[in-house]
Amino acid sequence: MRSAATALRLEPVAAALLLVWLLVVNVGTLGGVYFYTHAPVPAVWAGAVAAWGGAFACFGAAALLQFLVGFYAGLLALPLLWHAPSRARLLALAPWVAGLALVYVPFTLSGLADTGALSNDAFVEIYAYLRHPHHLVPSTWPWSLWQRKGLFYLGAWYLLHRTSAGRPTLERTVLHFALALAALTLAANWLFVEIVPSSLVTKLQPARVTPLVQVVVLALLATRVASFLARRHWLLAAAVAVAPFSLFPGLVLALAGVLSPALLAPSAPRWPLWLLGAATVVAFRPFGGDFDYHAARHAPWLGLWLVACLPAWLATRPATLCTAAAVAVGLALTAASAPDRLPLGLSRRFAPNQPPLDAPGRLGARFRAHSTPNAVVLAAPSDEMWSFKLHARRALVVDDKNIAFTAAGLREWRDRFTHILGVPFVPGVDPGAAWRAQPPNQLLAIARHYGATHLVDRFDWHATPPGHLIDREGDWGLWALPPP
């Protein structure tokens, strides 16, 4: 982050703002993807405690080279190499191409090994329409989402264009290239998923370029905030700084672009200041929701920005810096070792094995403590089963989160869902309704077919599930199944 701030010539306040934007803001992303996600990543903790950590180490190395991230990030960086010397360009491109090859060659070979497992159309149907519609099917994304993202990029482009006097030409080149790349990849997403299905394009998940494009736009906006602060245009800097957190970021940025000539003039009139200030306040909808709502929505990023401003101040005070570091490390270690003694907000941030918060998660945590590692569970097709599996650390017959993303793996996943639901698992089917329609004796037969020893279900879905009840939490129950 410090290197990026130095390259962009950002002062500490603007650098802290960019950091907060990258951690919190998602105004420019589509397809349910984010530059930084606040959700836990179970694989990290699983890799730390697994006896076969070498496999996770190899998986981590592959993730660093993964095609989805390395390919798009490399494309966005290409404009930076256009005017570079040939040797520097070669030294930059060689590792990128080598990394792509390390992923793309096995990727292609695994596809060849799966020849005949699924047709191209069937692969796209399962991978996109059944498993990842939120990532891959643009027609399922709300129109309001498209409008908000489009207005953000349009408003940001207009502001950057209107305030580009004296800025490097490369800056405009990078901006236009990033926006054009986003438009082209989203068009390819729609064309090769919904019109002419292509398994290759589907696997690349083109919408994943949008978080990286958002990074480019936010970094350029941070340079404008730094410039406005240096010229003491406080209100203009504040409006641009808080715009991405508002409900209408694109409109605030566009209005700032419209008013920027008047606001940046040596003798600026007062009415543009009042207009921009009023529009910024209204963009946060101050008259909707009570004080608690606004505090919960905006206090975290404001507090994070204040904390992010501290390193620059602490850097000039070594003794204070050491004290602050010791306090931070002490709090983290305390929260990790004794999460029950601290507020939930702290324990959830620092505890590597945070406690479950929902009924299936608490059920899974108790099941893990009283079951063998080889236990297999037949679970209802519900999103909440992810929490159960996370805390139980036991195998499920099938669930909607975990799947082998090969042709053979996708086919097995679809076949298992079809088996437990009793109806073909196709787009539009209601898994919950199909599960509820299955009689208890059929659930027992399915469990025995896959070697399941336990069943997780809701009491309002089946009045008399097979087996005997061994635990319950809220509306959820856990049954031990009779041996065959």
Regions found by a protein language model. Give the residues of each.
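Membrane-interfacial loop-to-transmembrane alpha-helix junctions, especially the N-terminal start
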Residues: 8-16, 92-93, 168-184, 226-240, ...
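Transmembrane helical bundles and short interhelical boundary loops of multi-pass, membrane-embedded
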Residues: 239-384, 395
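Membrane-embedded helix bundles of polyisoprenyl
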Residues: 2, 14-81, 93-108, 281
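Transmembrane alpha-helical segments
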Residues: 4-5, 46-52, 74-82, 156-157, ...
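Aromatic/acidic, Gly/Pro-rich catalytic loop(s) in extracytoplasmic/lumenal soluble domains
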Residues: 439-484
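Short periplasmic/luminal acceptor-recognition loop of GT-C membrane glycosyltransferases, typified by
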Residues: 333-345, 354-431, 445-461
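Transmembrane catalytic cores of multi-pass membrane glycosyltransferases
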Residues: 27, 67-73, 82-218, 222, ...
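Transmembrane helix interruption/hinge and helix-loop junction motifs
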Residues: 9-10, 50-52, 65-69, 86, ...
